[in-house]
């Protein structure tokens, strides 16, 4: 593979994460305006965004098999057509049913693109370099999560219709579409070059089960935590502005943490540092919940920094449980994480209704403790050390 081809594929991976991050995180910014547009209460409007998450979940799950049937380049180009149709649907229609359908299509497109992006990184890079590259790729999710809410705020403050926010997000896919030209993608399944030696199907091993549980609990814990921090902080007498600042502090330090760990991880055994980070994150979250309001910002900043490498390290370790990275395995771990996203309000909503926001935060803390236990047990069964060959590039 030529160096320019590798750079193009790497940028497609970066942008695939930015696309999903923009779509998922911008929701909170535009929900009120969309509810007004359809003359609906915000609470019932939030349910229609489940179509976005459902689209992401279904496409990540199905793409484990589709990757071997439909070439990656074809998928990305077809995704561009779907993206244009979905954004056009948002702009031209005043129907809630069509809005929900367009959200579902946007979810499908971003899920397919993100699973391809993850697979490309696991395919092109090996050993410790794979972990640091995946981490840097994942930082684009957070970066888009910082940039696009600002874009949305700028447009909405000037009374520009909410659907132009989605048109701006569509520009990310335009860049992906342009990058597919003159770019060779790895061939999979029936399109892969035939080799003399038959491919031996590797068993995944029990380590994948531990990592999948860790992925689900981590995402459910993280989103359950960050979704209820503003309500919890307001309950302690903080202003809405200060409560919102806690959330943006978390994502900012999360992004800086990703950049730092994309360098640091190269020098450590991935399973060991993951166990340390998971334990540290559980302790820091507990300290945040028990802290006085004046100390909360410091705890959430350190929590964001030290927890930033956990999810990507889980995916990387998953990809290293087999000698040859398997798209089905990587997508399985990703799917478990996405299920965590889907369950966020299903799990935390009733807890908050019954016992208040602090109970939701303590539940999230318990989930982080489960992640630590899974990572610790993984140390006894992981196969990544026998497959971990130093990368040549």
Swiss-Prot record:
Protein name: Protein TsgA homolog
Family in the record: Belongs to the major facilitator superfamily. TsgA family.
Single GO molecular function: transmembrane transporter activity
InterPro entries: MFS (IPR011701), MFS_dom (IPR020846), MFS_trans_sf (IPR036259), MFS_TsgA (IPR023528), MFS_TsgA-like (IPR050375)
Keyword field contains Membrane: yes
Protein's membrane topology: Multi-pass membrane protein
Organism: Citrobacter koseri (strain ATCC BAA-895 / CDC 4225-83 / SGSC4696)
This protein's UniProt keywords: Cell inner membrane, Cell membrane, Membrane, Transmembrane, Transmembrane helix
PROSITE patterns documented for this protein: MFS
An example Gene Ontology CC term for this record: plasma membrane
Domain of life, per lineage: Bacteria
Subcellular location: Cell inner membrane
TM spans (from-to): 11-31, 51-71, 78-98, 101-121, 134-154, 162-182, 206-226, 245-265, 273-293, 297-317, 332-352, 361-381
Chief subcellular location: membrane
PANTHER family from the UniProt entry: L-FUCOSE-PROTON SYMPORTER, PROTEIN TSGA
NCBIfam families on file: PRK03699.1
């Amino acid at each position: 593979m030529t160096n320019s081809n590798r750079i193009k594929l790497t940028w497609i991976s970066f942008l695939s994460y930015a696309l999903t991050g923009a779509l998922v995180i911008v929701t909170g910014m535009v929900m009120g305006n969309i509810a007004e547009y359809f003359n609906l209460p915000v609470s019932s409007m939030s349910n229609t965004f489940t179509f976005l998450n459902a689209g992401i979940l279904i496409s990540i799950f199905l793409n484990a098999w589709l990757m071997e049937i439909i070439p990656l380049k074809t998928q990305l180009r077809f995704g561009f057509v779907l993206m244009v149709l979905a954004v056009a649907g948002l702009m031209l229609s005043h129907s809630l049913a069509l809005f929900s359908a367009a959200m579902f299509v946007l979810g499908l497109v971003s899920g397919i693109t993100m699973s391809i992006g993850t697979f490309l990184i696991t395919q092109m890079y090996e050993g410790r370099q794979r972990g640091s590259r995946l981490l840097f790729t994942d930082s684009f999710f957070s970066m888009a999560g910082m940039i696009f809410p600002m874009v949305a705020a700028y447009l909405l403050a000037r009374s520009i219709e909410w659907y132009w926010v989605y048109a701006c997000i569509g520009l990310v896919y335009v860049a992906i579409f342009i990058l597919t030209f003159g770019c060779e993608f790895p061939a999979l399944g029936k399109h892969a070059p035939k080799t003399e030696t038959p491919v031996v199907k590797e068993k995944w091993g029990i380590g994948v089960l531990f990592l999948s549980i860790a992925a689900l609990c981590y995402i459910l814990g993280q989103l359950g935590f960050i979704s209820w921090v503003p309500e919890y902080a307001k309950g302690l007498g903080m202003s809405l502005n200060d409560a919102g600042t806690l959330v943006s502090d978390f994502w900012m330090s999360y992004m800086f943490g990703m950049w730092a760990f994309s360098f640091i991880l190269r020098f450590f055994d991935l399973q060991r540092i993951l166990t340390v980070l998971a334990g540290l994150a559980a302790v820091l979250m507990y300290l945040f919940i028990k802290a006085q309001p004046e100390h909360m910002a410091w705890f959430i900043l350190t929590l964001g920094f030290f927890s930033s490498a956990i999810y990507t390290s889980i995916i990387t370790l998953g990809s290293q449980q087999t000698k040859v990275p398997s798209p089905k395995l990587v997508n399985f771990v990703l799917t478990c994480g996405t299920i965590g996203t889907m369950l966020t309000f299903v799990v935390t909503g009733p807890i908050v209704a019954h016992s208040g926001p602090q109970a939701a935060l303590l539940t999230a803390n318990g989930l982080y403790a489960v992640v630590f236990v899974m990572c610790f047990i993984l140390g006894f069964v992981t196969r990544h050390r026998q497959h971990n060959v130093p990368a040549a590039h």
